[in-house]
Amino acid sequence: MILEELGKHKVVTLEKLVGLLDTSESTVRRDLDELESENKLRRVHGGAELPHSLQEEETIQEKSVKNLQEKKLIAQKAASLIKEKDVIFVDAGSTTAFLIKELERKDITVVTNSIHHAVQLVDKQIPTVIIGGGVKMTTDASIGGVALNQINQLHFDRAFIGMNGVDEGYFTTPDMEEGAVKRAILENAKQTYVLADSSK
């Protein structure tokens, strides 16, 4: 039952398992410890998650067809926040791709770590800077040391970033290198906006 829940949701809380299994917290903890020793799950604070090897991240193409209307509304709101002469960072991602579609201003500079975003921006004749580095296949995001070095040399008026998950007090992404890039963006922006739909 525990592995079945993890298969559906990728993460499960201790509280939820106690209710589902109708058993004590200590019994659930023991079961989780046993499953972790068999590498079938990974214990996290307050519950468990699938081991990273089983958490396949959806590709940018798979994400781009989900929650279209919500992503469009988020992008419209984000575009309304951009001011004349802003230097903005637009992160790789499916929701941020909708922001690129909303951008019409030529009086801004857009920095991005997405090959696809850069092509669309150049087609719109919007001044564009693309971050180099290795490319993460599932998200088309530039990652690694080269990307970090470039980002750390720049400053942004506003940054619009995507995340894989949003939880109380923190954001998540399953890739450490991509996480490091997002952290650098946050540190180099005057204002940062996380563009995340309700599936996060």
Language model features with spans:
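HTH-adjacent hinge/linker in prokaryotic transcriptional regulators
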Residues: M1-D22, S26-A92, I100-T109, L121-I126
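Conserved phosphate- and dinucleotide-binding cores of soluble alpha/beta proteins
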Residues: E4, V11-L17, D22, S37, ...
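Short beta->alpha connector loops
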Residues: G93-T95, S199-K200
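Alpha-helix/helix-capping structural signal
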Residues: S94, I115-H116
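Short hydrophobic/aromatic-enriched beta-strand-loop microsegments
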Residues: D107-S114, P127-G133
